[in-house]
Amino acid sequence: MKKVLVINSNPKPTEMSFGLRLGEHYLTTLQADADVQIERVNLYEENIPLIDGTVLDAWGKAAAGEALSAEQTSTLGRMNEILEQFIAADVVVFITPMWNLSFPTLLKAYIDNVVIAGRTFKYTAEGPKGLLGGKKVVHIEARGGIYSEGPTTGLRFTDTYLQTIMGFIGITDYENVFVEGMAATPDRAEEILASAKQRAEQSAKNLLAAVK
């Protein structure tokens, strides 16, 4: 059975979000296969530790073999839970909005919990090497403007960063399924979503065919 981990970084209700509606259509297609197990994580409903002074101090103490405080033990334990869940997945689906040319803060916090030296990448004489080859990442993204073509293509920092950081930990099988332009042409928003749903459905079918 293939494990699909879905990371939702949008706080809106599904019906209020083009990205979440697109994501649900994608996941509905996947769920048609009984050999797929889907696990969902809503970053706005979970405890996602930030890398702060407490965490940095805890890492230093752990490396030196020193005792951790109860708070540090709890925080590092939670970070390890997040990491193990990510490592156990065969496919990771990120559902994100583009906010101010980036994505929500909690997604960056989540990524900081799974990009861990010695676990998901390692340092070598030739440079960093990713350790999570063999997985697939699907990035389902909603953008109000047009960023897939024209003069704004270089501003697609959300997608380029996520693809780069996933490649850094060894996941090079990466796909971006996007819906865009709803704010630029609100009168066509539902039409745009319908077209994106067709692409998302085909993407999900391709994934199912590939993992058979």
Residue ranges of each PLM-predicted region?
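N-terminal beta1-alpha1-beta2 submodule of the flavodoxin-like/Rossmannoid cofactor-binding fold
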Residues: 1-96, 101-105, 109-112, 116, ...
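Residues at the starts of beta-strands that form the adenosine-phosphate
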Residues: 3, 37, 135-137, 173
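Cofactor-binding loop segments of dinucleotide-utilizing enzymes, especially the Rossmann-like FAD-
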Residues: 9, 142, 179
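Flexible, glycine-rich phosphate/dinucleotide-binding loops
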Residues: 13, 47, 146, 183-185
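Hydrophobic residues at beta-strand termini and immediately following loops
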Residues: 41, 140, 177
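Short, well-ordered alpha-helix to beta-strand connector turns
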Residues: 89-90, 134, 171
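Short, glycine-/small-residue-rich phosphate/pyrophosphate-handling segment
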Residues: 123-168
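Glycine-rich phosphate/pyrophosphate-binding loop and the adjoining helix
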Residues: 149-212
